[in-house]
Amino acid sequence: MATFDDGDFPAQTHSPSEHEDFGGYDNFSEAQQPPTQHQSGGFSSFNGDPASPNGYGFGASSPNHDFSSPFESSVNDANGNGGGSGGDAIFASDGPILPDPNEMREEGFQRREWRRLNTIHLEEKEKKEKEMRNQIITEAEDFKKAFYEKRDKTIETNKTDNREKEKLYWANQEKFHKEVDKHYWKAIAELIPREVPNIEKKRGKKDPDKKPSVNVIQGPKPGKPTDLGRMRQIFLKLKTNPPPHMMPPPPPAKDAKDGKDAKDGKDAKTGKDGKDAKGGKDAKDLKDGKPADPKVTEEKRPSPAKDASVETAKPDAAASGEGEKPVAVTEAEGTKAE
């Protein structure tokens, strides 16, 4: 059996008269063949002429737009420059898409200059920042050194001042405790001003606008009474329950014995003097001739010692009366004689 590849064609079943124009391949000559038009990237289309055997229709012209391929323009502009695939090769490269590097350098001159200036500016800025950073670090180190030196100096000064204040405080406390049992009011007056700052400090945290109840007034002011509530409170507290350091020290045993003997002698002496004074008063009353008040004598009966003193005073008064009588008589007699 003959095949198409072998070049054997089947016999014609119709007469040559049925096709006047085309009787066979022998009727065509090389001069009568129509010219073929090739266009890069195009697809062949049937326009009444047989398609070109070159490339199975690729590159053939398609004047009839009704049978043209819709992808023809896209194939022609495959590489973006309208060249399409050049020559007989399909999808052939037409060169690099980007332009020549030399042309790029010429086109980017301003940008390259800007980048160069920007790089210089950034380098200068970074250099200034480093210098500023080093300067700040140096100043910080100097400040830290000066701060620590000042702090150490302040600590030493505070230590010295605190030691002196502590010594003064203990000296004042010792002096206060020694003299507090002698002058209570002076001790109270010294305690009140010390407690006022503490009261103000405690109340200042809660309500700073509220004034303390105790106001220290230096000296009397007319029309403004001094608040003595705190003074009375401390006085009553010290009077009812005095602390041990305010109690008077007890006297030694020997001094107490001597004091007791002296007290007994003093009482005896004062009693004797009082009795003598009483006796002298009674004698004076009798001497003047004024009798003693009976009511007083009844209410205050004299003691035996007093009676004895009165009895001894009476003879003296009588004797003095008798001695005065002769003097008066002699004076009267002298006048009569004259």
From Swiss-Prot:
Q: Where is the composition biased (Polar residues)?
A: 29-47, 61-73
The biological process GO terms on file are: clathrin-dependent endocytosis; intracellular protein transport
List each coiled-coil range: 122-142
Q: Where is this region: Disordered?
A: 1-111, 192-338
**A GO MF term:** structural molecule activity
Which intervals of the chain are annotated as region Involved in binding clathrin heavy chain?
102-163
Q: Where is the composition biased (Basic and acidic residues)?
A: 102-111, 197-212, 254-304
Q: Which Pfam families match?
A: Clathrin_lg_ch
Q: Where is the composition biased (Pro residues)?
A: 241-253
Q: Which GO terms describe its cellular component?
A: clathrin coat of coated pit; clathrin coat of trans-Golgi network vesicle; cytosol; mitochondrion
Say if the entry is tagged with keyword DNA repair: no
Family per record? Belongs to the clathrin light chain family.
Which protein are we looking at?
Clathrin light chain 1
Organism field: Arabidopsis thaliana
Upper lineage is: Eukaryota, Viridiplantae, Streptophyta, Embryophyta, Tracheophyta
